[in-house]
Amino acid sequence: MLKLIIPTIMLLPLTWFSKKRMIWINTTTHSLIISTIPLLFFNQINNNLFSCSLPFSSDPLTTPLLMLTAWLLPLTIMASQRHLSNEPLSRKKLYLSMLISLQISLIMTFSATELIMFYIFFETTLIPTLAIITRWGNQPERLNAGTYFLFYTLVGSLPLLIALIYTHNTLGSLNILLLTLTTQELSNTWANNLMWLAYTMAFMVKMPLYGLHLWLPKAHVEAPIAGSMVLAAVLLKLGGYGMMRLTLILNPLTKHMAYPFLMLSLWGMIMTSSICLRQTDLKSLIAYPSVSHMALVVTAILIQTPWSFTGAIILMIAHGLTSSLLSCLANSNYERTHSRIMILSQGLQTLLPLMAFWWLLASLANLALPPTINLLGELSVLVTSFSWSNTTLLLTGFNMLITALYSLYMFTTTQWGSLTHHINSMKPSFTRENTLMFLHLSPILLLSLNPDIITGFTS
């Protein structure tokens, strides 16, 4: 694991010692090279000695998320260049340092073998994210968004710390492998039920589950482009990863406790999708589907079958790339029109035809059209939820219909129609932006050729 962690840490001195003209080139090229390192972890059988140590290790569940995290850093750096063009050099370097330190803490969170270490790095991701939102956001409401983000996450994760301390006192170890192999089955008592809630609540806030999701639209809307990309693509996946790791340890208690949360996630999925149909703010319309898609992931994880786990992992990777792509497209609109209101940026297809092509592909990926990897994830979750209960097909099917409606609504509102009067002149789409969209879309399409590499430890 050090062959991924050390090069990422070395990006920090590279950033601070780079000259003004070379800072973007250096950080982008080096982070792109680093993003290829997790490819070595996909061959788990032969290379297991190289990707496993006492504090850090990778397995088929961790590796796709590590790959997503590493792949996203060069994309966030590329997307932020216009946003930071008027900032002094020291602030550019500080911004890049925040992104790199966030990547380091995410890599360590995903690869930690001790649960207390996992908790520490899980909380560490808050600090750079909060700094990015509150310092580099565009509107004054960013401070309110930062407060929501901080308090929801901290209050949700405090019971997790108490549960971890209790587990360590009773069992004497918090090693994930040891707990998976040695723990006895938990009986269905009040104390154990409370412990299950304490373990999972932090991750349900992070996912977020419907009802605990109020921080996400605020943080997503007020964050700068890199903050929105990382928040949607990777930070929400921390919740899914934590739930998948810990619900295996907490079996068979999960089967008893899952029903209310399954119902809440299925209901929340419909509600948040319906909210999207009434949105006028483009970034808000991109933020709310994250709650809807993550509700599907919560459903898949709580059903606790190998196929549902596979669907959850695929859906997390697919949603990470798609949501990040939509955030980039919304940012490209915002940089030209200086407004997030969709009606004020309508008719852009006539001015930016290539960008309209990216918008079409992103919208189709969002509604899980073949040959995207999103389709495979949604189908896996759909089939497993149907085998768990037939009535879920009505809810999930209705959700897919609403998803198609708001995806096409987003595309038609921003691209079609007559141009508004305040748009007199507009810069064309840059090569940097087109490259950024291509680097988002190519994994979504290419993974559908060989989805085995991200199906997790169930394959």
UniProtKB/Swiss-Prot annotation:
What GO cellular component is one of the record's annotations?
mitochondrial inner membrane
Indicate where this protein resides in the cell.
Answer: Mitochondrion inner membrane
**Keyword Electron transport found:** yes
* Listed GO biological process terms: aerobic respiration; electron transport coupled proton transport; mitochondrial electron transport, NADH to ubiquinone; mitochondrial respiratory chain complex I assembly
Q: Which residues cross the membrane?
A: 22-42, 60-80, 94-112, 113-133, 145-165, 196-216, 224-244, 257-277, 284-303, 308-330, 351-371, 391-411
The record's EC number reads: 7.1.1.2
Keywords for this protein: Electron transport, Membrane, Mitochondrion, Mitochondrion inner membrane, NAD, Respiratory chain, Translocase, Transmembrane, Transmembrane helix, Transport, Ubiquinone
UniProt GO MF annotations:
NADH dehydrogenase (ubiquinone) activity; ubiquinone binding
Q: Which reaction does it catalyse?
A: a ubiquinone + NADH + 5 H(+)(in) = a ubiquinol + NAD(+) + 4 H(+)(out)
For whether the record's keyword set contains Heme, the answer is no
Bilayer disposition of the protein? Multi-pass membrane protein
* Subunit relationships: Core subunit of respiratory chain NADH dehydrogenase (Complex I) which is composed of 45 different subunits.
By sequence similarity, the record places it as follows:
Belongs to the complex I subunit 4 family.
Annotated PANTHER family? NADH-UBIQUINONE OXIDOREDUCTASE CHAIN 4
Q: What does this protein do?
A: Core subunit of the mitochondrial membrane respiratory chain NADH dehydrogenase (Complex I) which catalyzes electron transfer from NADH through the respiratory chain, using ubiquinone as an electron acceptor. Essential for the catalytic activity and assembly of complex I.
According to UniProt, the name of this protein is NADH-ubiquinone oxidoreductase chain 4
- Source organism of the structure: Pan troglodytes (Chimpanzee)
Lineage here is: Eukaryota, Metazoa, Chordata, Craniata, Vertebrata
